[in-house]
Amino acid sequence: MNTVLSVQGASAPVEKKSFFSKFTRLNMLRLVRAVIPVAVLMMLFPELAMAAGKGDLMAKGNDTVKATFGKDSSIVKWVVLAEVLVGAVMYMMTKNVKFLVGFAIISVFIAVGMSVVGL
């Protein structure tokens, strides 16, 4: 795409650079030169990179998460209620059954996801 740049009445076409022009060989080499030292350090010190051997770092908050998002928590009930209300309103506005089915599918995914993570 060409644009026109005018300075005091004179005009010269200026070609707009493409997004892909940033992915040159020199820029890729600069990126690799920045990423390789970090990757090597992560390989040499995996205990720092992944907290290996430290046990479960999030175990302390497990009870809090289960109390907040567990099966009998009020947040789950409010989320399901919000899904039903939004689905009903969207159906009434558009008269499209896909919204009702979509929110039912989202409810199933949320229930399955919570059972997978153990809530």
Curated annotation (Swiss-Prot):
It comes from the Bacteria. Belongs to the TraA family. Its main location: membrane. Residues 1-73 are periplasmic. It is found in: Cell inner membrane; Secreted. The chain crosses the membrane at residues 74-94, 99-119. Propilin is the precursor of the pilus subunit, pilin, that forms conjugative pili, the filamentous surface appendages required for cell-to-cell contact during the earlier stages of bacterial conjugation, and that retract after contact is established. Mature pilin is assembled with the help of TraQ and TraX. InterPro entries: TraA. Residues 95-98 are cytoplasmic. It is a multi-pass membrane protein. One of its GO terms (cellular component) is plasma membrane. Monomer. Interacts with itself to form filaments; also interacts with TraQ. Keywords: Acetylation, Cell inner membrane, Cell membrane, Conjugation, Membrane, Plasmid, Secreted, Transmembrane, Transmembrane helix. The modification N-acetylalanine is found at A52. Pfam families: TraA. This is Pilin. Residues 1-51 form a propeptide.
